[in-house]
């Protein structure tokens, strides 16, 4: 059996080497047991810097991408955060150690239920899970200080921009369904004004919804 504690330390060291310097993100990832979010058969690779498959044809992002996206949201502590694409729940559990409250939307009920159970087992009482169309956001809990989207959209869903607080940041991959996307950081400057920053090329599963890609199933 792999020494997960040692592997976790090495993972954080690698994140620092690759340019992640947000101490809150590093501390959270250095304490959370990532192996608890990995499907059986892939646990040995829990701390490798690679995406891994989970159920419903989805993936858990590589540790670097998780760290980079959360760090790009510039969370200082106590924020109201929306996550689109709960997946295994790992990213939400990291965010929960930094932010005040996190609301996470997952399209697949099986993934949402499994993530909810993990959160309960870990005692994460500031994570709220909903099954539904992530491209619509979570309007009842808006506005948000940050929105992090773990799936690629054809364009920026308007409801997500509308649910940002002034000064809030939206981190979202935008581009093709099957190829690469650009990771964008959208900052709300005022009611109608938004700044856009390109953070680089990425590859995510598609965001499916009425404000995103159509469901092909």
Curated annotation (Swiss-Prot):
Catalyses which reaction(s): [protein]-L-isoaspartate + S-adenosyl-L-methionine = [protein]-L-isoaspartate alpha-methyl ester + S-adenosyl-L-homocysteine
Entry EC no(s): 2.1.1.77
Localisation per UniProt entry: Cytoplasm
Annotated GO biological process: methylation; protein modification process; protein repair
Pfam families: PCMT (PF01135)
Active-site residues per Swiss-Prot or TrEMBL entry: 61
GO cellular component annotations of the record: cytoplasm
Keywords annotated in UniProt: Cytoplasm, Methyltransferase, S-adenosyl-L-methionine, Transferase
InterPro entries assigned: PCMT, SAM-dependent_MTases_sf
Listed Gene3D superfamilies: Vaccinia Virus protein VP39 (3.40.50.150)
A GO MF label: protein-L-isoaspartate (D-aspartate) O-methyltransferase activity
Domain of life of the organism encoding this protein: Bacteria
Similarity field: Belongs to the methyltransferase superfamily. L-isoaspartyl/D-aspartyl protein methyltransferase family.
HAMAP family associated with the record: PIMT
Reported function: Catalyzes the methyl esterification of L-isoaspartyl residues in peptides and proteins that result from spontaneous decomposition of normal L-aspartyl and L-asparaginyl residues. It plays a role in the repair and/or degradation of damaged proteins.
Protein name: Protein-L-isoaspartate O-methyltransferase
């Amino acid at each position: 059996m792999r020494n997960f504690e040692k592997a976790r330390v090495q993972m954080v060291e690698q994140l620092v080497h690759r340019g992640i310097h947000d101490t809150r993100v590093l501390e959270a990832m250095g304490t959370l047991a990532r192996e608890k979010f990995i499907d059986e058969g892939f646990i040995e690779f829990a701390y490798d810097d690679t995406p891994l498959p989970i159920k419903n044809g989805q993936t858990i992002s590589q540790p670097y991408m998780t760290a980079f996206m959360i760090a790009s949201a510039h969370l200082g502590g106590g924020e109201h955060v929306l996550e689109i694409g709960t997946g295994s729940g790992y990213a939400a559990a990291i965010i929960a150690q930094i932010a005040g409250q996190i609301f996470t939307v997952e399209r697949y009920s099986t993934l949402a239920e499994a993530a909810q159970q993990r959160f309960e087992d870990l005692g994460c009482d500031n994570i709220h899970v909903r099954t539904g169309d992530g491209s619509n956001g979570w309007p009842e809990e808006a506005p948000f200080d940050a929105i992090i989207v773990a799936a690629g959209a054809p364009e920026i869903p308007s409801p997500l921009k509308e649910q940002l607080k002034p000064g809030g940041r939206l981190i979202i991959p935008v581009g093709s369904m099957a190829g690469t996307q650009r990771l964008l950081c959208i900052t709300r400057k005022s009611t109608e004004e938004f700044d856009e920053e390109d953070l680089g090329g990425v590859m995510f599963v598609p965001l499916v919804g009425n404000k995103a890609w159509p469901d092909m199933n």
